[in-house]
Amino acid sequence: MSADTRFESLKAIVPAVSRETANRLIAFEDLFRKWSKAINLASPSTLNELWTRHILDSAQLFPLASDAKHWLDIGSGGGFPGIVTACFLAEQPGGAIDLIESAGKKAAFLRTAAGHLHVPARVHSTRIEAMWEKIETPQVVTARALASLNDLFGLTELWLTNGAKALFQKGRDYQREIDESRVGWSFDLVQHQSAIDQASVILEITNLRRKVA
């Protein structure tokens, strides 16, 4: 796939995207492939569709909160959606994202990617719980392929109950996860259909509260 084809496919997801952001994402794809030869950053079966399955899939989050300047991505793994979001934030004055990743090798990759791409990403190589009191409430919290919705609420409760919006990417079992989480939590939900996978959704969650037994 040529750079122009990649740019056009990105514009279909984020119409206002600049060529500079597209070039950053293309550079990230190249860096990701190089590091993937040494460490497991993503399922090998998806590397042939890296641009679509991971980069475009992550890019679709940004238009849902494009005015937000402080983002937080938990369980950042290989940088989806955290580094992808950082590429968009690089053109937003004052924009920044915190990435939390406990695996040392993946955190090292994230730091390398942030430096190589010159994007405003701060990488924290620790457990999510260790950052509860250290990261001020962001405007947006993201997570992709990390945990059940119920567990995500437990991990992000401090931020989501203090005004942060969640954008959680979920697969085909999302409705079961929503139903199970409503047993112990109340929240406002807007469900966005994924532009990449018709069986997947983005759950936009606000006003999270733990139910009192």
UniProtKB/Swiss-Prot annotation:
It comes from the Bacteria. It is found in: Cytoplasm. Its main location: cytoplasm. Gene3D superfamilies: Vaccinia Virus protein VP39. Its EC number is 2.1.1.170. One of its GO terms (cellular component) is cytosol. GO terms for molecular function: rRNA (guanine-N7-)-methyltransferase activity. The keyword Transferase applies. S-adenosyl-L-methionine binds at residues 75, 80, 128-129, 144. It holds the Pfam family GidB. Keywords: Cytoplasm, Methyltransferase, rRNA processing, S-adenosyl-L-methionine, Transferase. It catalyses: guanosine(527) in 16S rRNA + S-adenosyl-L-methionine = N(7)-methylguanosine(527) in 16S rRNA + S-adenosyl-L-homocysteine. InterPro entries: rRNA_ssu_MeTfrase_G (IPR003682), SAM-dependent_MTases_sf (IPR029063). Belongs to the methyltransferase superfamily. RNA methyltransferase RsmG family. NCBIfam families: rsmG_gidB (TIGR00138). Specifically methylates the N7 position of guanine in position 527 of 16S rRNA. This is Ribosomal RNA small subunit methyltransferase G. The gene is rsmG.
